[in-house]
Every structure is written in C-alpha cells, then in structure tokens.
Amino acid sequence: MSRYVFTSESVTEGHPDKICDQVSDAVLDALLAQDPSSRVACETVVNTGLCMITGEVTSKAQVDFIHLVRNVIKEIGYSGARAGGFDANSCAVLVALDQQSPDIAQGVNEADDHAGDPLDLVGAGDQGIMFGYACNETPELMPLPISLAHRLSRRLAEVRHNGTLGYLLPDGKTQVSVVYENDKPVSIDTILISTQHTAEVDGISDEQGIRERITEDLWTHVVEPATADLALKPSREATKYLVNPTGKFVVGGPQGDAGLTGRKIIVDTYGGYARHGGGAFSGKDPTKVDRSAAYAARYVAKCLVAAGLAERAEVQLSYAIGVAKPVSILVESFGTSALANDALTALVQEHFDLRPGAIIETFGLRNLPQQRGGCFYQDTAAYGHFGRNDLNAPWEDVTAKSQELKQVAAA
C-alpha cells in the first residue's frame, strides 16, 4: 500500500499577487466589454502606495483605467482607516500601456497554416505548452487539496466582507495537506491559515490572546462551514490545525509585500497536483493560448473523466506562434483507464477542435464580459479558474460532450 501526504495552497483576493491578477483581468473585462476583438496583455505591479499597469493593448474601447483600478482595489477591501499603506483612494496609479507588436499581431490575425477555414485564420498568440487536468476526487472533478484550500480562502474572505469577523483584513493564505492511500484521499492531515488582522481583536491586545481568539473563531466560522458538506472532514482531534504560526499578521497586503500579475499560477490551476506549462492567465485576451488553451485542456480532461473513460486525466497541448493547429496533443491517464493513452489521444484529436479560433468560438471567450454585465475574467482571478460552480464557466460544462464521448467509446 502506498501512503503519502499531498499539500496545496490558496490565497485570498487581498493577497498582493492576487490584487494584481484581479486588476489585470478587470482591465481585460473593460476592454472586451466594449470591443470583443481587443488584444490585451496587461501586467500589474503593486507596492506600498503604488499600483502600476503596463503591457500592450490594441482596442477601440475607451476606458478610464485609473478609476477602474481604484474601484478594484476598493472592492477587495483596501480603503479607509484600515487600509494601511495601500489605500484605493490615495495610492498612486500609473498607466503605461503600449500597442501590441505588429509582428505578433500579424501571426494572430492570419495564421501561417490557414486554408480557407475561417477558424484557421486565428493563429496562436505565442508558442507554449499548456496542461489540463481532472480527477474523480471531488464532485467538480478537481484534486481534493486545492479544492479544500480554495473553500477555506473563499470563506475567509466571506466572513470578512459580511462582518462576521470584523477584525479580519484582506490579506490571507490557506494550505491543506491530505493523506492519500493508493492514490485515494483518506484523511486531512493539516490545515494552515494565515490571515491579516487588526492590531486589536475584539478588545484583546496581547499577541497570545489574539492568536487564541483568531484560532477558535476561524475553526467555528471558516473551517467548519467550508467543509460541512464533505464526506471527508477535518476534526480538531485528528487534524493538525495551525493559525498565524508567526504569532501575528497585522502588516500585510502591498504594504508588506510587493505583488505581480501571474505569480500564483499553481493556485490558479491544480495546486501542484498536475503539471503546469508555465504561462499565467490574468490580463491576457483569448488569443493568448496560455489562457484559452489551458481552459480547453481542462475541458478535454474533465470530459474524459466525466465520461468514465479515466479516473484521472492530464492533457498536454502545445502551439507555435502564428499557427492554428496544435503542434502536439497528449493524454495521460496514469493507468486509470481501460483505454491506452494513445487511444485516448486519438479520441481527443478526432472529437475536439483545439485551434485557438475554435476554442474562442466554442466557449464564447471574447463575449463573456459583455454577456456577464462587464465582469467575467476578474471573477476568475481569485480562488482558481477551474472547478468553480459559481462562475458558470463554459469550459466546466461538460455534460453534452462527455455523453458524446461515452457513446463513441461504447460503440
């Protein structure tokens, strides 16, 4: 019997790197909502009293970027008396956006391998490799460690926003360690929560007292509600439970650490449980295969698992800049499928169109911000891009396609 512990982490929307992801995706949303053909590559950096957006944009949209940035920061919770050294109302906002390189635009606008099919006209925005993954550990077909970590971080933000724990501040992280036996989760080994808080907590000012109060409050208001519907639950007796191990966490957010777009790519995906091609998502329009092809790879993997063709599936895609068709497609089932990996790969090649133009059209990626009231990608930028029931993301809707695959495999 094999036994091991696997750990994944999540961060709250107030983590400095996640502020940047949300700002970059808010810029993307605003541009696509007005002009769905916008080309966007927006990077954000934050530090004490500063937020800068930079990158390349080609769009007909007219956006007040400074107002937009301040609104995002305020929504997260950095404003007013408790904002510390990073206040939406007073921080410096710098905008340094250029146009997309004509050399890159040329390859995206007209693919090198087009042959009359309109979907062949959209070439990949860059070379690269992307991975998608799914497994049957959770109803959303995600690995349990990252699923639990996201549940905790989202609940941590929720009790801050609704005032249940009024002493909480925006910055926070969670980490969950799960025990596996024969590749199946059997128990929760450790839960770690680090959360920013006010200097005094409900009138308590000594460090030990603050830590004890937060520890009890988080178990009652975060851990228990976040895991209440799970068959595999943590317990105070059996699960190691750590809260703010350094003792206190008062200085946080961009005042404590600088943040950058794209530095939480493992949090954004599968918590390290599957491979990652290295490309970040936020701030990138759908012609960037770092984003759109990663969504497609998740869709393919989830379809295979939902169809019962594998218990675990990892899909690798690769692209060349300016070329529409993938350079390679590979499926790995880790021995959990009755079909060989090459047979699964052939099935994917036959039944999924993975050209960038087809991915954009299948999921409606250019029009999602417009259809969702001007905000879609910003919502993906915290708490993961996959396994999210709240987003109604098109790459998570596999009902029809998985049934099609099941019928094909049974024939």
From Swiss-Prot:
**Pfam families in the record:** S-AdoMet_synt_C, S-AdoMet_synt_M, S-AdoMet_synt_N
Q: What are the binding positions for L-methionine in this chain? A: E56, Q100, D257, K288
Q: In which pathway does it act?
A: Amino-acid biosynthesis; S-adenosyl-L-methionine biosynthesis; S-adenosyl-L-methionine from L-methionine: step 1/1
Residues bound to ATP: H15, D171, G172, K173, K248, F249, D257, R263, K264, A280, K284
- Top-rank taxon, per record: Bacteria
* BP-aspect Gene Ontology terms: one-carbon metabolic process; S-adenosylmethionine biosynthetic process
Principal place of residence: cytoplasm
The enzyme's main class, written as a single word, is transferase
Location of region: Flexible loop = 100-110
Spell out the reaction equation it catalyses: L-methionine + ATP + H2O = S-adenosyl-L-methionine + phosphate + diphosphate
* Keyword Nucleotidyltransferase part of the UniProt annotation: no
One GO cellular component term:
cytoplasm
* Places the protein is found: Cytoplasm
Q: Which UniProt keywords apply?
A: ATP-binding, Cytoplasm, Magnesium, Metal-binding, Nucleotide-binding, One-carbon metabolism, Potassium, Transferase
Q: Where does K(+) bind?
A: E43
Self-association state and partner proteins as the record states: Homotetramer; dimer of dimers.
Write down the NCBIfam families for this protein, in alphabetical order.
Answer: metK
Q: Which family does it belong to?
A: Belongs to the AdoMet synthase family.
What name appears for this protein in its UniProt entry? Answer: S-adenosylmethionine synthase
Source organism of the structure: Synechococcus sp. (strain CC9605)
- What's the encoding gene here? metK
